[in-house]
Structure formats: C-alpha cells, structure tokens
C-alpha cells in the first residue's frame, strides 16, 4: 500500500472486508472504521485516529483494553495451552468466585457468547416449567438465535403479542413460541401474562431497551411476571 494515504489504507481494508465478510463486518452492526489497537478505554483505527471506546467489546472488556495484569495472565496461559475440552483448575476457581459473588447463581455454565447464554437459559426455563413460550420485550436485543431475533425494532403496530422475525430463514414454528410485549407498558404486559400464564416458560429482559433505560417502576411491576431467565 505504498504511496497511499492513511484514509486510502483504511478504505482499502473496508473494501476488502466487504468482499470476504457478509455485510463487510464480523457481526450485524457495521461501522465505517477499522480498529488497529486499544489501550484502556481508548482505541485507534488504521489511520491512527483515536476514539473513546464506549462499547468495550459489547461488554467483556470490563477493565479496558490490554490491561497489564490481564495481558500477563493471558500470555502465561497461552504458553501452557488454551483449549482442553476438559475441566481445569482455573476454570473451576472462576466458577466458584462467580457463585460466591452472585447470590442467585447456584452453579455456572460457561459459554462463548450472549447468544449461547440466552439459548441455554430459554432451554432451562422450558425444561423446568414444561412450557414452550417465552415473553420478550419489543426492541430488546438478546443475541442472534432464531428465538431472540424477533421484533428488535419497535414498530408500535399494536399487534401484540405477534412476533416479527428480523431475519430470513427463521421458521414459523419458532415465531409461534415467542410472545412480544411492549417496553414500559405495564398494563399490556400484565394482560399478556394473564392471557398466556399457562403457556409461558419465562421472560427475556434487559436492564434497558435498545434506546432507553428501564424505568424503575416498570421493573418493579414486572417482578410478578414469569421467572426472568435472562437479565443482561
């Protein structure tokens, strides 16, 4: 790329991504920037431009990028091996620490993504209750599974509880097992819960919707709904 400006180099990488990645991105949310490195709460793109990182990997970078202690621990473990498909002492100790720190976590199942966590949670709720339907709030994002990719964008059609798939390829049978409720509308939520109380296995909820935080009064009013199997 000799002779190219920083802007040209960045655009060339974006163009390459569009040829080899669906949508030109690793996920479903594209940004016209290619990150080169990160340190603490800041990242730099391929042109050297600096940004304050409010995303932090969508959650996992709790102590920021390239934290010295995290880097040192990761390098030490890489030298000993990374994936064993078996129990290991450090993983068990981490699970023990989580159980001690989280009052409602009696046991821990480690997964690689929020999508997997939601899938396991829905499966556990269905197994425990022997019911199939899950209540989800319109506009809430809970990963990329068929069950979660429903009614991500609030449409305010008033046609609750019908689920609207947000991707092609989602079977109708999956849609029929999801009940969609409006965010921050206690009256409608209560009505849906009463109507489907004998079918509901649980509800999937977040601390906030896609565009706003959950009002405390709404959270309190939902406390009597079916067991919340995912609260992220």
Regions inferred by a protein language model and the residue ranges of each:
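Active-site-adjacent loop/helix segments that line or gate small-molecule/cofactor pockets in enzymes
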Residues: 2-39
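Active-site and channel-lining beta-strand-loop segments
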Residues: 33-53
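Hydrophobic "anchor" residues on beta-strands that sit immediately upstream
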Residues: 49, 202, 231-232
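Glycine-rich loop-to-alpha-helix module at the N-terminal edge of alpha/beta enzyme cores
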Residues: 50-132
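Short beta-strands and strand-loop turn motifs
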Residues: 52-55, 202-207
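Residue-level signal for inorganic ion chemistry
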Residues: 74, 178, 203
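PLP-dependent aspartate aminotransferase-fold enzymes
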Residues: 96-199
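Active-site core of PLP-dependent enzymes with the aminotransferase class I/II
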Residues: 185-192, 205-231
